[in-house]
């Protein structure tokens, strides 16, 4: 299995390969598509070490990463994602239990990422834009913004986080991480729409005006990933001269 992440800026373009060794063991490998992306891939080793120390306080393990040349080799983890676990609870109508489980992980994010007051840095502005944020937000020095239910693996005796590629070594408000957890679970599957009446954003302390800012941050982040590259889904708008009405 190979997944290409090539609709990106050249310095971020990679592919992910899952392969099986002679002994049947599966491994995951992230490889730069361009020489410019080698530093991005090699950085995963440093990120793994940093997150391992951070997540230890909440008894969360990090998918182990080993750098070989310009490639990152990661263990292939088995288990069920938190996203799938939440979906099973939803299908069984156990929405109270779903909410309790989901918010236990939201609390873990807050415990890990609320160590000091947030202040904007030039690095933050470069990725997320010079957005107008509340003054009471908290953060840490390192921010894995992709700590979403699909990237959390639950097994019999441990909880692990995978796919931590979008970890930044500068402060990002913890509330933005919580926003992404909720957004990427609630908004990307119609069957989860019934949960919107449970007001997850409000219960997490996220106000409508906060959401407006976080939508802008997410847009700026996606533009940072693209760089000068134009994604196929956006290409028509750029090359089409527009519609002409013919009578």
Where are these regions (language model features)?
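Juxta-kinase regulatory segment immediately upstream of eukaryotic protein kinase catalytic domains
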Residues: 1-5
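ATP-binding glycine-rich loop module of kinase domains
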Residues: 11-53, 84-86
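Short, exposed beta-strand/loop patches in secreted or surface proteins that constitute
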Residues: 15-21, 61-66, 152
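Conserved structural core of kinase catalytic domains
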Residues: 62-129
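Short glycine-rich, low-complexity/disordered patches
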Residues: 109-138, 191-204
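Catalytic activation segment of kinase domains across protein kinase-like and atypical kinase folds
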Residues: 126-192
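Helical subdomain adjoining the active site within ATP-dependent kinase catalytic cores
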Residues: 169-178, 185-247
């Amino acid at each position: 299995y190979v997944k290409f992440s090539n609709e990106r800026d050249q310095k971020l373009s990679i592919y992910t390969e899952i392969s099986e060794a002679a002994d049947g063991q599966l491994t995951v490998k992230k490889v730069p598509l361009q020489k410019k992306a080698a530093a991005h891939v090699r950085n995963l080793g440093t990120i793994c070490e940093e997150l391992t120390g951070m997540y230890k306080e909440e008894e969360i393990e990090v998918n182990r990463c080993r750098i070989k040349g310009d490639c990152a080799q990661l263990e292939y983890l088995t288990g069920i994602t938190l996203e799938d676990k939440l979906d099973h609870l939803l299908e069984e109508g156990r929405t109270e239990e779903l909410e309790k489980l989901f918010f236990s992980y939201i609390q873990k994010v807050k415990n890990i990422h609320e160590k000091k007051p947030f202040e904007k840095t030039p690095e933050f502005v470069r990725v997320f834009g010079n957005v107008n944020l509340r003054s009471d937000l908290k953060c840490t020095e390192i921010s894995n913004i992709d700590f979403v239910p699909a990237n959390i693996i639950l097994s019999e005796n441990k909880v692990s986080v995978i796919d931590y590629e979008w970890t930044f070594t500068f402060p990002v408000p913890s509330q933005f991480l919580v926003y992404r957890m909720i957004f990427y679970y609630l908004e990307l599957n119609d069957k989860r729409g019934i949960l919107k009446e449970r007001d997850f954003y409000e219960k997490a302390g996220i106000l409508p005006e906060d959401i407006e800012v976080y939508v802008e941050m997410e847009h700026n982040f996606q533009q940072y990933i693209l760089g000068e590259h134009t994604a196929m889904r956006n290409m028509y708008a750029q090359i089409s001269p527009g519609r002409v009405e013919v009578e």
